[in-house]
């Protein structure tokens, strides 16, 4: 009852608006009278009146743009307020649009006031040609419009007799009247009562949801049937295996008692064992009594199958694709962006995916090599939220691949557009999180790092990290990882020194975060910026060592060792030589260690689906945009490269969260040589109990009183671990190398030339022998070894909530 009262006035207003729209005047009067009698308050201004006033404003704006010859403003309003169905199917709308295109194409020639802007004329004619090749192509067979297809190619159309009529004032006045009449009818039809709109949207959403559920049901039933067959087969094999095992145990017992096993018995057992994997006759024809036959077949039965060749995708007409991405309607743009993304994300890693990526790059899909006013990257500023989101998702896929990062980094304006989009979007929007992920992955490239630092992105990131309540796990993880990557550069550390107190307080708040990966990035950022003496002094004055020792946790050896290295850096007296800028050189070094990794959830929670009879995905591309076969790219697939950093140290090479995660998985399965068991021994003598919580702003963080290792043991062990001779002793012939991350000395100063950027993608587990062409800063194996992840951010699953309102 309380909910009804809360929305009662709005509901009554909906009823009143509908009765007024349907001209039920007597019913409306009775309804209004009864509401007044019962003390029910009706809204003073009906929704219909508001809609009518809005319609008049829209109509006025369109007419004004028509009279001023403002082609951009006019067609932006046209696309926004004229229904797509009307534009595509209504003959009156199509003919009117054709004449409107002519009006705007010749507008500078008719209203030149003695001076013609040639650049403006060329742009308008080019726009008209594009229209004729796309939307206007449907009218090419109509006699009425056929002469106008030659208009863009006539040097002086005003003097041509075929076009004499359209340059007369009466033609423009008549066209204006037709436009006003059309708008009054169409816009009024679109101003339906909210009650009808709610009903239609609900009905449409229900139908769409039903289609999705039916599709999911079909897929689930198919999977269930497949799994059931697999289960039945496994169950049968299991029962058969148990029976064979029981017989073999009986045979072994009989052998112990002196009874012999006959060849016939062995043949029958092996026939039973292999009967499910081959035909009965084939199993019986094999002589299992020969030594090694049965065991060889058993081993061969579990050998991995030879990888099958994956076919390449058909080539596409990229010029037509880019035209539709720039000039098509919003739904078509979204469907194309979705299909292009799916082609990358749903392709098989290796030659198939590499060929798709190289085709996109060679055809300049994102117009990174062009500076036209209208290009695909401008879709980031589209008024449609779905188009912006799907554009960001496609760029995100590019940024997840090494060659893709090289490609999109070649557009100097892209980074600025991404940063502006990130700042402009709402705090918890999907687009903002996607753009953040792109920026983080681009921070693997040194040129991008330099540009981000020059744009003061570090201070924006500090502001973001200051209030983490509005950040999802994904956003927090990628924000701190991006911040760490920028802090690994000398210029980034200098930037942090401008506001050292603020930066240190924000990082100290994050030291107690429950997520292991986030703490790793915080530790890496702290270790890096503490190389600057002024930041060290500020940290000492705020009691940073006491704060750090508070977070040394019992049982978390990796984090404890990180903190010990940070404390050692904090107490160091080394000077920061600003003349050494080896890590700020713009040359891309060691890019061959960079690796590809697509996040598993890039296609999760799609917000548009193909309607009945509508093409989407690969069907859309191969039906409407099939091109000449050009898939002949042979891309050399780079193997895992890079070297492993000791898990004891804070991160000192740029990283991306999912890379860091995969790297630790690799380390667990084929990990580097472990230090001797006496590494970092702790005893009661070299442990000190922290008795009270230090003065820190992270009071909400949960922590316990733990122990910490004394720095003496760290010094001795670090010198042993970082020495080349010690490393040579530790690794065998096939063991991955441990990166020598000992701080190299140049004239007595620290050098950090071994530090490179990272992104949460895939890291390498083996060294590369041959250098491949320069791509981007490497992924390396520098993260601490992880034994478990918090459920909050241990996976990179985005907390993306899709925009459901566009499901149409």
Curated annotation (Swiss-Prot):
Residues 196-230 form a coiled coil. Keywords: Cell projection, Cilium biogenesis/degradation, Coiled coil, Cytoplasm, Cytoskeleton. Residues 785-808 have a biased composition (Low complexity). Residues 579-599 have a biased composition (Acidic residues). GO terms for cellular component: centriole; ciliary basal body; ciliary tip; cilium; cytoplasm. GO terms for biological process: cilium assembly; positive regulation of smoothened signaling pathway. Residues 655-668, 677-709, 775-784 have a biased composition (Polar residues). Residues 7-39 form the LisH domain. It is found in: Cytoplasm, Cytoskeleton, Cilium basal body; Cell projection, Cilium; Cytoplasm, Cytoskeleton, Microtubule organizing center, Centrosome, Centriole. Involved in ciliogenesis. It is required for appropriate acetylation and polyglutamylation of ciliary microtubules, and regulation of cilium length. Acts as a positive regulator of hedgehog (Hh)signaling. This is LisH domain-containing protein ARMC9.
């Amino acid at each position: 009852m309380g909910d009804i009262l809360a929305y009662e006035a709005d509901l009554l207003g909906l009823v009143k608006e509908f009765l007024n729209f349907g001209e039920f005047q007597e019913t409306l009067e009775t309804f209004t009278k009864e509401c007044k009698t019962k003390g029910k308050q009706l809204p003073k201004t009906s929704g219909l009146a508001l809609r009518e006033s809005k319609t008049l404003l829209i109509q006025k704006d369109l007419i004004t743009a028509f009279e001023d010859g403002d082609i951009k403003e006019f067609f932006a309003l046209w696309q926004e307020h004229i229904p797509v169905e009307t534009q595509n199917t209504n003959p009156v709308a199509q003919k009117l649009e054709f004449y409107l295109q002519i009006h705007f194409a010749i507008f500078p020639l008719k209203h030149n006031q003695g001076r013609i802007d040639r650049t403006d004329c060329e742009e308008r004619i080019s726009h008209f040609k594009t229209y004729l090749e796309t939307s206007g192509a449907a009218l090419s067979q109509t006699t009425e419009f056929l002469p106008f297809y030659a208009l863009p190619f006539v040097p002086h159309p005003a003097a041509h007799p075929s076009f004499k009529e359209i340059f007369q004032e009466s033609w423009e006045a008549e066209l204006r009247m037709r436009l006003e009449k059309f708008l009054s009818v169409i816009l009024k039809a679109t101003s339906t009562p909210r009650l009808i709109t709610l009903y239609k949207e609900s009905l449409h959403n229900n139908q769409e949801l039903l289609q999705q559920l039916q599709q999911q049901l079909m897929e689930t039933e198919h999977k269930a049937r497949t799994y059931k067959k697999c289960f039945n087969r496994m169950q049968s094999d299991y029962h058969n295996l148990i029976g064979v095992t029981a017989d073999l145990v009986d045979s072994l017992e009989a052998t112990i008692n002196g009874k012999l096993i006959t060849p016939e018995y062995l043949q029958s057992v092996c026939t039973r064992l292999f009967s499910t994997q081959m035909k009965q006759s084939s199993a019986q024809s094999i002589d299992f009594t020969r030594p090694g036959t049965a065991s060889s077949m058993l081993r061969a039965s579990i050998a991995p199958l030879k990888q099958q060749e994956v076919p390449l995708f058909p080539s596409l007409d990229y010029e037509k694709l880019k035209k539709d991405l720039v000039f098509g309607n919003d739904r078509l743009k979204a469907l194309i962006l979705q299909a292009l993304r799916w082609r990358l994300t749903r392709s098989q890693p290796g030659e198939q995916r590499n060929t798709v990526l190289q085709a996109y790059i060679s055809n300049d899909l994102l117009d990174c090599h062009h500076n036209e006013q209208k290009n695909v990257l401008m879709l980031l500023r589209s008024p449609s939220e779905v188009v912006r989101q799907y554009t960001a998702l496609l760029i995100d896929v590019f940024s997840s691949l090494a060659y893709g990062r090289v490609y999109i980094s070649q557009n100097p304006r892209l980074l600025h557009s991404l940063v502006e989009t990130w700042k402009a979007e709402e705090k918890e929007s999907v687009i903002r999180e996607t753009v953040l992920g792109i920026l983080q992955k681009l921070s693997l490239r040194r040129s991008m790092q330099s540009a981000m630092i020059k744009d003061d992105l570090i201070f924006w990131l500090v502001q973001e990290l200051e209030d983490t309540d509005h950040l999802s796990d994904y956003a927090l993880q990628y924000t701190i990882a991006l911040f760490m990557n920028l802090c690994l550069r000398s210029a980034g550390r200098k930037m942090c020194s401008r506001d050292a107190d603020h930066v240190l307080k924000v990082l100290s708040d994050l030291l107690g975060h429950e997520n292991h990966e986030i703490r790793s990035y915080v530790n890496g950022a702290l270790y890096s910026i503490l190389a600057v003496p002024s930041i060290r002094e500020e940290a000492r004055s705020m009691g940073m060592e006491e704060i750090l020792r508070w977070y040394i946790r019992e049982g978390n050896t990796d984090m404890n060792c990180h903190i010990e290295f940070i404390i050692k850096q904090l107490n160091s007296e080394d000077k920061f030589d600003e003349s050494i800028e080896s890590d700020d050189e713009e040359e891309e070094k060691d890019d061959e260690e960079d690796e590809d990794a697509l996040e598993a959830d890039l296609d999760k929670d799609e917000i548009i689906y193909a309607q009945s009879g509508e093409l989407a995905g690969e069907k859309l591309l191969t039906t409407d945009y099939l091109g000449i076969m050009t898939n002949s790219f042979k891309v050399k697939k780079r193997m895992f490269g890079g070297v492993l950093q000791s898990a004891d140290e804070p991160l000192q090479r740029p990283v991306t969260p999912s890379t860091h995660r995969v790297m630790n998985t690799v380390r667990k399965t084929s990990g580097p040589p472990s230090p001797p068991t006496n590494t970092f021994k702790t005893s009661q003598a070299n442990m000190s109990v922290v008795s009270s919580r230090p003065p820190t702003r992270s009071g909400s963080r949960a922590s316990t009183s733990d122990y910490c290792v004394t720095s003496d043991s760290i010094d001795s062990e670090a010198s042993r671990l970082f020495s080349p001779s010690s490393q040579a002793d530790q690794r065998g012939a096939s063991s991955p190398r441990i990166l020598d991350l000992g701080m190299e000395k140049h004239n007595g100063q620290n050098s950090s030339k071994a530090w490179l950027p990272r992104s949460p993608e895939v890291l390498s587990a083996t060294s590369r022998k041959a250098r491949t062409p320069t791509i981007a800063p490497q992924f390396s194996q520098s993260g601490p070894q992880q034994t478990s992840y918090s459920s909050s951010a241990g996976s990179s699953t985005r907390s993306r909530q899709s925009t459901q309102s566009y499901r149409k």
